[in-house]
């Protein structure tokens, strides 16, 4: 974002670096320029509960940024090499007030985040494994991907089957089996580096009622 040039600090973050812990008091607004940050909580039994991810253009922690909490609700941990921009909350909010067009973009961003969250919740409500996975793929397409060719959405993070298992509550073995079927059916294509979702094939599997044509521009990219 051009408005932030000159007022932000860029940090290169190594993989598996914890940026914020649950309960921390943040010192600045963080914006993902590249890479991916996992957002999660740790339950009383020590189990990790994935809440979502932050990819290029996302900010965190949102509740603190906009004054709705005094500390963080989640852990924020990089899942790959990432570039993170940091800026003071005061400077960030002043820029939004001075530039209404940018404020509108952030309003759009919050709607995007909310929509993604609703799709995530819907995935957990599904009875069958394949339906849970299809909804998570829909979530990834809406929330964490870019359309590089018509109907071809490239996920902005290294989407592993263990990640899908963590988001759905399914076993890794079940995810591996179902993802293999979806790959053969042309819904997805993936390798060690890239993960592609084909919108029309996903729409066909989900059905017209479950699939909405949702478009959001990313804040940064």
Name each model feature, range by range.
Residues 1, 52-111, 115:
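Cyclic-nucleotide recognition modules
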Residues 1-15:
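Short proline/glycine- and basic residue-enriched helix-capping loop/turn segments at helix->loop/beta transitions
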Residues 8, 26-27, 155:
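Short loop/turn microsegments at loop-to-beta-strand junctions
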Residues 11, 30, 52, 77, ...:
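Residues that recognize and position ribonucleotide moieties
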Residues 17-80:
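Cyclic nucleotide-binding regulatory domains
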Residues 63, 109, 132, 215-221:
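Long cytosolic regulatory regions associated with cyclic-nucleotide signaling
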Residues 101-167:
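Polybasic "coupling" helices that flank or enter modular domains
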Residues 142-221:
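Phosphate-/nucleic-acid-contacting segments
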């Amino acid at each position: 974002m051009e408005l932030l040039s000159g007022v932000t600090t860029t940090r290169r973050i190594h993989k598996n670096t914890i940026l914020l812990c649950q309960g921390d008091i943040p010192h600045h607004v963080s914006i993902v320029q590249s890479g991916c940050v996992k957002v999660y909580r740790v339950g009383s039994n020590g189990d990790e509960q994935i809440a979502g991810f932050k990819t290029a253009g996302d900010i965190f922690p949102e509740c603190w940024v906009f004054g709705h909490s005094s500390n963080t609700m989640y852990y924020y941990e990089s899942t790959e090499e990432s570039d993170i921009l940091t800026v003071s909350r005061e400077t960030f909010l002043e820029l939004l007030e001075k530039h209404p067009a940018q404020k509108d973009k952030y309003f759009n961003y919050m709607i995007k985040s909310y929509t993604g969250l609703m799709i995530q919740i819907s995935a957990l409500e599904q009875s069958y494994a394949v339906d849970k996975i299809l909804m998570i793929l829909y979530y990834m397409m809406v929330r964490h991907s870019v359309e590089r060719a018509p109907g071809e959405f490239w996920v902005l993070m290294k989407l592993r089957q263990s990640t899908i298992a963590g988001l759905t509550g399914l076993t890794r073995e079940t995810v591996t089996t179902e993802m293999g079927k979806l790959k053969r059916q042309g819904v997805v294509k993936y390798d060690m580096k890239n993960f592609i979702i084909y919108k029309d094939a996903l729409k066909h599997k989900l059905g017209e009622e479950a699939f909405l044509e949702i478009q959001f521009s990313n804040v940064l990219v």
